[in-house]
Regions:
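Short cytosolic juxtamembrane segments of multi-pass membrane proteins
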Residues: 249-255
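Pore- or pathway-lining transmembrane helices of multi-pass membrane proteins that form conduits
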Residues: 29-35, 167-187
Length: 255
């Protein structure tokens, strides 16, 4: 019964966060304009050089990589928003309510589901306009979007932990950039790992974003994906196991 009430309360706070998004739509820039800008930038500025002139081939390679990179980048905002809410005393009011301690954070993550879904749809749709083509099936497209969103939701707990740990919302962005940039550019999102030095390839091969990107590429373009999907879900579970309790501990300490 308690779990049922906690879920209901989390859904109520999810609705609260969605209402905030409708009132401040500029918060959606990172999941609407950012994917379009990144895809255009990498395809038309760097694509010719990286793919030796074949932008279409590079687009096929690039788009799954950018899905992974942009969902990681878009996770920054949830940590910033939670940090700002704590500074405003919003969570002091929540403490007076008969709700579970994890409910405010879970509600925020549930609301982010819709942001990540919007990001993935925009990325695939804009990619299609530019010439990206799925060579598998609509069912595998849904699987690719599903695994991407699951990874994003688990990675959001990293951002929440940072948001509970640092003092200001601006610091959240700085810390998350330091984390996401090595994961993004030290992965196979933009170039093949085989073109990198051996020491960097070792990092790429264990990078969670590399496993996600490889899984999405296989689901959208074909090829063996079972191992990469398995590694991706292992990372999803690992991130939740580690960062959910860390974020909760930070939340309890701050409030």
């Amino acid at each position: 019964m308690k779990k049922r009430f906690n879920l209901r309360h989390a859904l109520v706070l999810c609705k609260r966060n969605l209402i905030k998004l409708t009132r401040t739509p500029e918060q959606l820039i990172d999941v609407t304009l950012q994917p379009i800008i990144f895809l255009t930038l990498f395809l038309f500025v760097f694509g010719g050089a990286i793919a030796h002139g074949s932008r279409h081939e590079y687009l096929q390679f690039l788009l799954p990589g950018l899905i992974g990179q942009t969902i990681a980048m878009s996770s920054i905002s949830i940590g910033q928003n939670m940090n700002a809410d704590i500074a405003k005393g919003v969570f002091d009011r929540f403490r007076s309510l008969p709700i579970g301690r994890s409910v405010p954070l879970v509600g925020a993550v549930l609301a982010d589901f819709f942001r990540y879904l919007l990001l993935c749809v925009i990325m695939v749709g804009f990619g299609y306009i530019l010439g990206f083509r799925i060579t598998t099936s609509p069912l595998l497209l849904l699987a690719a979007l599903g695994i991407s969103i699951c990874f994003a939701l688990s990675f959001a707990w990293v951002s929440l932990w940072v948001g509970m740990t640092v003092r200001t919302a601006g610091a959240v962005q700085g810390v998350m950039f330091l984390l996401i940039f090595p994961l993004s550019f030290g992965s196979n999102a933009f170039v093949q790992a085989s073109t990198m030095p051996g020491w960097l390839q070792a990092f790429v091969n264990v990078n969670p974003l590399s496993h996600l990107v490889s899984a999405v590429r296989g689901l959208l373009l074909g090829g063996p994906v079972a191992a990469q999907i398995g590694w991706t879900f292992a990372w999803i579970i690992g991130l939740l196991v580690v960062f959910f309790p860390l974020a909760m501990r930070g939340y309890i300490r701050r409030t």
